[in-house]
């Protein structure tokens, strides 16, 4: 599918499992990692569990702040730098040129963990090319989002052979079940259906944004499968809005920290 050597791939129990393996490989008590304040929390759970210190950089206008992340990484000599693109939880997206420049400026001794769980919702030509010669970048992708196989827990990492081989030292060798493997293979072979799903998701996002617009709410241009809606208030107001929607059987989430928590998310 990617036309890359098999030994440049590692498979795990979703990206969550792979994040755990990455931290287990490289983080010892007292080591520093860098992420964004309000970013996907599971990475922080793993870092805390292995005794690492996590430096959290605030978002800049609903985007992860690439310049500030680089600065924090260099200043702290971080072992791992975590970035999601498209972003979770805000759905924003950095261009391939911006990401490539970001990658080119990562210190050699820092591992960049590029979480691309939502990359299937972006045209492949909009993504920075995968360079398997670069030894300090691992890109994580999943079958949980666009492919709809979240319950089967299939995630995978793409990177340099040497980096990928290291995962064999710590991974759960029986963690990926056979049913999940079969489903993932079949899903990859049915790209026509994936395109149908992507078109339906895009239409649904536009419909959801239009409904909220009628009531005076604005939304972000999301490059994921969810719509971030600006509540127009603070986190407490957004929480009340979320609770009301949940009571109407509309499943809604919201970011956990200010100022991101003025938004709610509808998938």
Predicted regions and their residues:
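PLP-dependent aminotransferase-like
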Residues: 17, 25-83
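PLP-dependent aminotransferase class I/II
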Residues: 136-213, 217-220
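PLP-dependent enzyme catalytic core of the Aspartate aminotransferase-like
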Residues: 97, 101, 240, 244-253, ...
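Conserved beta-loop-alpha segment that forms the PLP phosphate-binding cup at the N-terminus of a helix
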Residues: 6-30, 155
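Active-site pre-lysine segment of PLP-dependent enzymes
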Residues: 48, 66-76, 89-149
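Short acidic capping loops at alpha-helix termini that bridge into adjacent secondary structure
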Residues: 5-9, 29-32, 109, 116, ...
